[in-house]
Amino acid sequence: FAETGQLYRGSKPVMWSVVEKTALAEAEIEYHDYQSDMVWVKFPCEMVVRKGPTVVPGQSEWNQLASLAPVDEKLLSASVVIWTTTPWTIPGNRAVSFNSKISYGLYEVTAAPPGNWAKPGERLVLADELAEAIRKAAKIDSWERRRSLTPEELAAGECKHPLHGYPYPGEYGFRVPLLDGDHVTDDTGTGFVHTAPGHGTDDYQIWM
């Protein structure tokens, strides 16, 4: 292997047995059917204008085009919404993934029950194909679609971590980038994928 160049040093997330105190191969993992609770999580937008077109080795084409994207002030008060059945991985979040082939829209809530997680006036960024299902599941009475978002705008965007400032000021103060990934679909969820590189291979690969 060494003579043919197949031996290399790398890194990847691996399964870990708390009981055995050792790493586990994927072939050793058995999954049982389990009904999980799901949560919606809002990532407040921080759309950033990057100065001048720059080419960064290793960056995707969309991220390089992001330097040309204008910023809509309405997006500064919007939130990218993710859907997850593994809320315990949120502290490990370092990015949100989208798919440049999916159509996304900016939706402004116009009516919602008292105490709802989404309040009138809030703006949410979602995949258009899933918007109506999300509205019903989230018990939002009505909203209006304000406009479309381009892949360039999404790639130019960054979000605040949902735990920003918790439990102490300055905690989780880093920005969360939006990354283009083919593994994101509009079959279920919101069209955005919470990305925690320490909790999955897809997450790790796109984040790296």
Question: What does each of the following model-derived ranges do?
Answer:
Residues 1-208:
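NTP-handling and nucleic-acid-processing catalytic cores
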